[in-house]
């Protein structure tokens, strides 16, 4: 009996890599394995472009050693100019600033830099060994890391000034045994004396000096009819076992010198030292939040500044009104303060979204929310939204207002309830690429960096090879296309020796601003204005620029000099670094043609590829070469065989192309799609197809059709 023939069309091979499906349950449109393919939302699949330096690139004046780390951040609204944005590049212990205003990007480094060793915390791992986190507020940049005292950078017309933030809090910690404070003590301990003064006793302005009274109510509750303190009146008040309010003293958060503040010696903790420093910083609700201390006492502590009007407000993390005051003890909505999450372990990242601040620790995620959509010091809530924490801060990325991060178990995101605003964690890798993710080396996961392309809606995570000796080198990319909800991997190949390499990622929107100096003239431009000393008078103004297409920018280290420059995936020569081949391929899932029992054949596959040639280079003497030629190699494997048959060329043009020497920009081919029919040998119950690139050539696969023959015999 003759075979029954059917046809199948595939035109949406863009679901990405799937490793969590079995042979019999593999989803349509997904790949079993793939590398270096660009999945496009129109349903096509293309070879990624090669990596190269930007046009007219410049090398940095500084070098990057094998052991130096690199971290990247953004400074927005620089100096209060909404159009001015800097890329902040941490190289070891130095911060460099690149204006995002103009091309080439690598030439836009500012003349100023910040030496972090000047603010290094004694006993830390060193400023060069701790990556910074950044927050922008009111045109200023706040910089934190576990190795430095938190600083703020101000932009002052082509220069910056740096100041260390001094964190002040009110002391709400009782020093003595509070169970004895419900009664008078004629011989109070030194700790009790401090606690009495911290509740308002012996602090001047009419406060009595007697430190023997019980601390169940404030001293001014004992005033007589004349407004004077009366010990007998104070004694008439029953306070029970309630402690009065404290917090009169304002102390430095990192060095709580109670002896100096109170003048009392002999305290159990005269000076309370916090040796660690804030790892995280985030601006939210007009304030700056700080977290990430490593001590047992303060691991879950989050400080937040008062509503910041000036730089001096950034360290005011306390109630402005004295809580022991008789008339103005109230906590104000605009005050600073302290939030404690006792069960948080190693807070890694703070992220502000809508009316909430999300706290990412190693052991979970917490949400700090305001009331009625506004965070205030006197009205907020804290709740835990996930027990899945953040592996390390640079895996975190925000895309379309939604956080994505790597944990010890996979890649996660948060969805928020549109009514309550409460977050809910979702694991993205369990149904998709968990096996692929698990295979990434544990040390490599600790060096992941990320960025988000907000134009093309893609998240890029980059990480090194196993055992990579260069601290900041990144060879591998895992990409998540948000609209497609598809993961796909890329890999940058090394040159044979002294290879260039990627060390960082950034996103450039294509817009920016820069400061211009204009010569001041008079008399309709005829006369130049100078000072009495003969110096030329100029006027500074900020102008906006369109820098071109938005793009992911790669920060690269030049292999010959170890200096830095910028590049991207832009080479239509389809070679990495201009001379190194890379393989682009994709393998389809297991196609049983709707039948698990019968054996089949696929005598013909018809592929559809878009014409990619864009013209010619060369001349009559040396010949002409097509610009951006394509090649697509196709092979098949039957049943569950991992060895594919010999490949065939699927990009076959039917018509000759005549070169017009007078117009090399034209590639005069009559069709925009190359259609090729391939004969396929073999048979089996299922078939897989592999598409692969050829060195130095493009491909753009639109889809394919398969003629399927089914054998009526089993």
What are these language model-derived features?
Residues 147-163, 300-304, 408, 413-416, ...:
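Short, surface-exposed terminal/edge motifs of secreted or surface/virion proteins that either
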Residues 357-385:
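Surface-exposed extracellular loop regions of Gram-negative outer-membrane beta-barrel proteins
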Residues 1-109, 124-139, 345, 388-391, ...:
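Beta-sheet repeat architectures centered on beta-propellers
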Residues 122-124, 146, 205, 223-226, ...:
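Intrinsically disordered, low-complexity serine/threonine-rich repeat tracts
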Residues 90, 120-156, 288:
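Elongated alpha-helical scaffolds
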Residues 158-164, 374-379:
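A short alpha->loop->secondary-structure connector
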């Amino acid at each position: 009996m003759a075979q029954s023939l059917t046809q199948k069309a595939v035109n949406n091979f863009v679901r990405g890599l799937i490793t969590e499906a079995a042979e019999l349950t593999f989803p349509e449109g997904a790949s079993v394995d793939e590398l270096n393919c660009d999945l496009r939302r129109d349903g096509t699949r293309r070879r990624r472009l090669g990596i190269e330096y930007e046009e007219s690139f410049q090398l940095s004046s500084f070098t990057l050693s094998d052991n130096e780390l690199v971290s990247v951040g953004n400074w927005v609204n620089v100096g209060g100019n909404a159009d001015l944005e800097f890329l902040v590049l941490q190289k070891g212990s130095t911060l460099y600033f690149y204006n995002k205003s103009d091309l080439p990007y690598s030439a836009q480094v500012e003349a100023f830099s910040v030496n972090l060793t000047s603010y290094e915390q004694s006993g830390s791992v060193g400023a060069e060994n701790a990556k910074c986190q950044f927050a922008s507020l009111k045109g200023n940049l706040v910089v934190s890391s576990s190795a430095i005292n938190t600083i703020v950078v101000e932009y002052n017309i082509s220069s910056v000034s740096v100041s260390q933030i001094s964190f002040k809090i009110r002391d709400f910690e009782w020093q003595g045994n509070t169970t004895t404070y419900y009664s008078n003590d004629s011989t109070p301990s030194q700790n009790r004396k401090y606690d009495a003064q911290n509740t308002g006793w012996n602090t001047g302005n009419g406060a009595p000096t007697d430190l023997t009274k019980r601390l169940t109510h404030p001293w001014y509750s004992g005033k007589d009819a004349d407004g004077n303190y009366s010990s007998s009146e104070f004694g008439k008040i029953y306070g029970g076992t309630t402690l009065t309010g404290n917090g009169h003293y304002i102390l430095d958060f990192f060095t709580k010198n109670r002896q100096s503040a109170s003048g009392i010696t002999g305290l159990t903790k005269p000076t309370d030292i916090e040796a660690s420093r804030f790892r995280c910083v985030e601006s939210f609700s007009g304030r700056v939040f700080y977290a990430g201390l490593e001590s047992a006492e303060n691991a879950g502590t989050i400080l937040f500044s008062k509503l910041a009007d000036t730089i001096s407000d950034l360290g005011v993390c306390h109630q402005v009104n004295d809580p022991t005051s008789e008339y103005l003890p109230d906590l104000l909505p605009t005050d600073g303060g302290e939030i404690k999450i006792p069960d948080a372990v190693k807070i890694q990242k703070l992220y502000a979204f809508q009316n909430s601040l999300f706290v990412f620790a190693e052991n979970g995620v917490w949400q700090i929310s305001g009331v009625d959509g506004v965070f205030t010091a006197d009205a907020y809530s804290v709740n835990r939204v996930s027990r899945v924490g953040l592996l390390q801060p640079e895996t975190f990325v925000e895309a379309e207002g939604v956080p994505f991060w790597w944990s010890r178990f996979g890649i996660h995101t948060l969805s928020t309830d549109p009514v309550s605003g409460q977050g809910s964690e979702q694991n993205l890798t369990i149904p998709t690429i968990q096996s692929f993710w698990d295979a990434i080396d544990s040390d490599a996961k600790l060096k992941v960096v990320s960025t988000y392309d907000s134009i093309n809606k893609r998240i890029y995570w980059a990480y090194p090879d196993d055992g990579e000796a260069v601290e900041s080198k990144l060879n591998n990319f895992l990409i998540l296309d948000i609209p497609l909800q598809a993961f796909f991997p890329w890999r940058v190949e090394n040159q044979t020796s002294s290879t260039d390499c990627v060390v960082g990622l950034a996103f450039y929107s294509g817009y920016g601003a820069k400061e211009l100096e204009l010569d001041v003239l008079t008399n309709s431009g005829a006369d130049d204005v100078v000072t009495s000393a003969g110096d030329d008078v100029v006027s500074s103004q900020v102008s906006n620029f369109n820098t071109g297409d938005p793009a992911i920018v790669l920060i690269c280290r030049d292999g010959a000099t170890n200096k830095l420059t910028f590049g991207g995936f832009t080479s239509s020569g389809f070679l990495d670094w201009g001379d190194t081949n890379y393989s682009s391929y994709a393998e389809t899932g297991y196609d049983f043609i709707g039948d698990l029992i019968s054996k089949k054949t696929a005598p013909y596959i018809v592929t559809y590829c878009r014409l990619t040639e864009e013209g010619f280079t060369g001349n009559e003497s040396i010949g002409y070469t097509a610009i951006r030629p394509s090649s697509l190699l196709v092979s098949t494997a039957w049943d569950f065989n991992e060895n594919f048959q010999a490949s065939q060329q699927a990009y076959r043009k039917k018509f000759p192309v005549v070169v017009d020497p007078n117009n090399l920009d034209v590639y005069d081919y009559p069709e925009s799609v190359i259609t090729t029919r391939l004969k396929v040998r073999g048979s089996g119950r299922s078939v897989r197809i592999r598409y692969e690139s050829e060195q130095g050539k493009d491909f753009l696969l639109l889809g394919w059709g398969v003629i399927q023959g089914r054998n009526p015999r089993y």
